[in-house]
Amino acid sequence: MSEGVGTFRMVPEEEQELRAQLEQLTTKDHGPVFGPCSQLPRHTLQKAKDELNEREETREEAVRELQEMVQAQAASGEELAVAVAERVQEKDSGFFLRFIRARKFNVGRAYELLRGYVNFRLQYPELFDSLSPEAVRCTIEAGYPGVLSSRDKYGRVVMLFNIENWQSQEITFDEILQAYCFILEKLLENEETQINGFCIIENFKGFTMQQAASLRTSDLRKMVDMLQDSFPARFKAIHFIHQPWYFTTTYNVVKPFLKSKLLERVFVHGDDLSGFYQEIDENILPSDFGGTLPKYDGKAVAEQLFGPQAQAENTAF
């Protein structure tokens, strides 16, 4: 288990103070997006307790229970249960804790999420057979997707997608999903991200009818499957901005695949960003997403994820 997890007990008065803090947080009250979490902020520990039912005294017991459930289910011989056991046999307790947190310490539901995690990889092997830093680096450098280097005021990791310059002939939809999968795996190593979750901003300014026509239903379904029950991630909000009128046609293809919980977290703003700015501060957003920072730089983010790129290294697909 990560050493960053808190080991102190809080009395009710302290808990009330921390709950009050949670209502007034800014982006500066959270840890870094990239790299491990050295120590969870006290208010984040309180959030885990309140929202995820996490308790120090039951954390290890829950992990052990999930590990035992994996083995017990595999003993039945059911194909997916066996695949789950094989996939996790060398994983540490921190890996299991991600799934338990994502399902609010309900071990049975955490196991179902683990099944979904493995099944997604079996169902779409094309996303994982060549998944490596070298395979996805140039896609991430191009900004598909982007990741802000600062968390939002809720402590969430903010992922970006700007569709205007996307050419499917140059970067395929599967290559974009590969990059999403790699980033999710990487950033979920951070415990603060496990607890606070993700927010996704999709800028559809410049979305053309040709792009809309090129999006296959099977690709859109694959994207939705990635967001639902396939990662130990809390997707807290998906914001669409600057979408044209014909975006509705694409969205109507996706909506039947969305479960009610995720559908309630989708916000379609158009060009009126007043409600959007109530949730996402302008001062953490790049200018191409309506913020005050310089234009998004995918190469800088790739260096945060992978380190500097050697000149001789070939990261093309």
Curated annotation (Swiss-Prot):
Residue ranges of domain CRAL-TRIO in the record: 136-297
GO cellular component, one term: nucleoplasm
Keywords attached to this entry: Acetylation, Cytoplasm, Disease variant, Retinol-binding, Sensory transduction, Transport, Vision
Keyword Transcription on entry: no
SUPFAM superfamilies per the UniProt record, alphabetical: CRAL/TRIO domain, CRAL/TRIO N-terminal domain
Disease note: Bothnia retinal dystrophy: A type of retinitis punctata albescens. Affected individuals show night blindness from early childhood with features consistent with retinitis punctata albescens and macular degeneration.
Function: Soluble retinoid carrier essential the proper function of both rod and cone photoreceptors. Participates in the regeneration of active 11-cis-retinol and 11-cis-retinaldehyde, from the inactive 11-trans products of the rhodopsin photocycle and in the de novo synthesis of these retinoids from 11-trans metabolic precursors. The cycling of retinoids between photoreceptor and adjacent pigment epithelium cells is known as the 'visual cycle'.
Protein name: Retinaldehyde-binding protein 1
Organism: Homo sapiens
Gene: RLBP1
